[in-house]
């Protein structure tokens, strides 16, 4: 069953939300107007705008925003002529009044994210969003960490609370091919006609497009991506590449492939601080199953304490850290620094 009469699937571009991590949350109103204008003209149906960690994310722990996110949402709504504007919120970080304000500012899709075993904390937020007339989407973050049957049960909690589409969210970019299909299929089987299923991928193992296509084949009707891979870690599924692949496969997205390619190169790239690369740290994240937004934090702590960023991420993966535990990266870095100092002292003593 297609998403609608005109679209086989619906694509949401997260450049102005997930890309906030890569931009260190320094988006301006001008950035938003430029990117929304280009994506809207290319036919992208949904554009997500908030701090990288969602409503209320501007903080010492996650990083402070250059511009209040509600101002960015307003600018996006004012600029978009066809695209719907979505926002993300994490219960406990964002609060109910944030949802109301975003709705008042014209956003029409509320995306609520929880760790993939904690769907129950989203129930009241879905209820509020539906009462406000918002379309609702649920994110089961770090979906690689749980088997399909567990995710299906969590998806049921969200759907029963009023969520209209539940996403398998590969926050770490750690899922590989059939692991995506199995999880999406499990949600489709569980939810039936009660809610749609979506997929949010990252490029940390270089599989964003392939995983997204497999998700569609398994029944996903909504797919996330970011133009020019503008997202956390190695970035998200590149919308321009996904649009090209789906066009070749005869999957209707409503996106003009050539226009989105131009938008990626001419509009989005100049706003990025640098390309989102599949480098040592981002690849380590996918390999170790680490939350993608940890990348910049790990890199900063590695420089500050003179330790290996990759070792920080490997230990974060061993501890199975999740979003919200960024402070533990400092603890890990300090531990590595202490160990390095001790090893240096032993080596110097032996050589004396």
From Swiss-Prot:
The enzyme's E.C. designation:
4.1.3.39
Q: Which reaction does this chain catalyze?
A: (S)-4-hydroxy-2-oxopentanoate = acetaldehyde + pyruvate
> Any one Gene Ontology biological process term?
L-leucine biosynthetic process
Q: Which CDD domains match?
A: DRE_TIM_HOA
Carries keyword Manganese?
A: yes
Where do the annotations place substrate binding?
A: 17-18, 171, 200, 291
Q: Which Pfam families match?
A: DmpG_comm, HMGL-like
Instruction: Report the residue ranges that make up the Pyruvate carboxyltransferase domain in this protein.
Output: 9-261
Q: Name one GO molecular function term.
A: 2-isopropylmalate synthase activity
Key word Lyase present: yes
User: Mind telling me which InterPro entries this protein's record contains?
Assistant: 2-IPM_HCS-like, 4OH_2_O-val_aldolase, Aldolase_TIM, DmpG_comm, DRE_TIM_HOA, PYR_CT
Q: Where is this site: Transition state stabilizer?
A: 17
The alphabetical list of record keywords is:
Aromatic hydrocarbons catabolism, Lyase, Manganese, Metal-binding
EC top class named in words: lyase
The chain's coiled-coil residues are none
Name under which the protein is recorded: 4-hydroxy-2-oxovalerate aldolase 5
Organism equals Rhodococcus opacus (strain B4)
